[in-house]
Amino acid sequence: MNKALKALGVLTTFVMLIVLIGGALVTKTGSGQGCGRQWPLCHGRFFPELNPASIIEWSHRFASGISIILVLSLAFWSWRKITPIFRETTFLAIMSIIFLFLQALLGALAVVFGSNALIMALHFGISLISFASVLILTLLIFEADKSVRTLVKPLQIGKKMQFHMIGILIYSYIVVYTGAYVRHTESSLACPNVPLCSPLNNGLPTQFHEWVQMGHRAAALLLFVWIIVAAVHAITSYKDQKQIFWGWISCLIFITLQALSGIMIVYSELALGFALAHSFFIACLFGVLCYFLLLIARFRYESRQS
């Protein structure tokens, strides 16, 4: 496979990750209005004023603009080169373009017209899908280079494992929205203790922001336990299928790091590094879970053909 196409895939995936984390940086630093209510200009200028909020917001917009060029190029090139090898290519190329433009549109509308916490949470959720689409498209490019298709040999995925893969993917997306809602309602430090909320009221939440925070913690705890269950099933029953075995090991690592970074956000009183790490780990986890969905689609297709 063309080395330039591989390089483009890696670069595009990296830039999409930068855009995703950059959006979290804009939110964490309160830089959403760093360029005023103007888009694409920044206070009527192409280049930003030399203050942190304007530079952060402008940099996020610039990275988003670069990502549009890269994603369009990657989608078209991969569609031309690897569609004959992988039938999923066209779907992923279209997905990456559609969700990228939805992501950009929501961001622009939020700047110009203002937005609420629910809309901004939706913006982050769409950004995750956009990133995952590009990530999987890049994986396909590398897989297409395997002359014997060693990475995509026929799989055997039982109904129990399919349930875990699909269920955890859907549920993790819901948990992502609860986390984004925590961020956009400024509820990150509503509960100063872990795992309970505070010394008051036996550690239970008493007002809206505390309920938002504890609701996210409860949802995240269930996700953590569910991934442990799925990982144990993979370790005991899928040792010979590397994509599934190592995929769940990766998920277990990412969800553990995700939980630790979330705890450190509370104890560090919203340290920026931990907050950005929290966004990074969930992006990695979601990418692996989306790849599982691709494996299921392949398995079902090959089962119908046999």
From Swiss-Prot:
The name on file for this protein is: Heme A synthase
Q: What is the lineage of its organism?
A: Bacteria, Bacillati, Bacillota, Bacilli, Bacillales
Residues that bind heme o: H60, H123
Instruction: Summarize the impact of C42A.
Output: Abolishes catalytic activity
Mark the transmembrane ranges. Answer: 3-25, 52-78, 89-113, 116-139, 160-185, 211-236, 243-268, 272-294
Spans within the Extracellular topological domain: 26-51, 114-115, 186-210, 269-271
Q: Output one GO MF annotation.
A: metal ion binding
Q: What is its main location?
A: membrane
**Please, one GO biological process term?**
heme A biosynthetic process
What is this protein's gene name? ctaA
Membrane topology type, per the record?
Multi-pass membrane protein
Organism source for this protein?
A: Bacillus subtilis (strain 168)
Q: Where in the cell is it found?
A: Cell membrane
**Which UniProt keywords are given for this protein, alphabetically ordered?**
Cell membrane, Disulfide bond, Heme biosynthesis, Iron, Membrane, Metal-binding, Oxidoreductase, Transmembrane, Transmembrane helix
Q: What is known of its domains?
A: The N-half (TM1-TM4) and C-half (TM5-TM8) domains are connected by an intracellular loop. Each domain is formed from four-helix bundles and they align in a pseudo twofold symmetry manner. The N-half domain is the substrate-heme O binding domain and the C-half domain is the cofactor heme B binding domain. The cysteines of disulfide bond Cys-35 and Cys-42 may be involved in transfer of reducing equivalents from quinol in the membrane to the active site of the enzyme.
Q: Which GO terms describe its cellular component?
A: plasma membrane
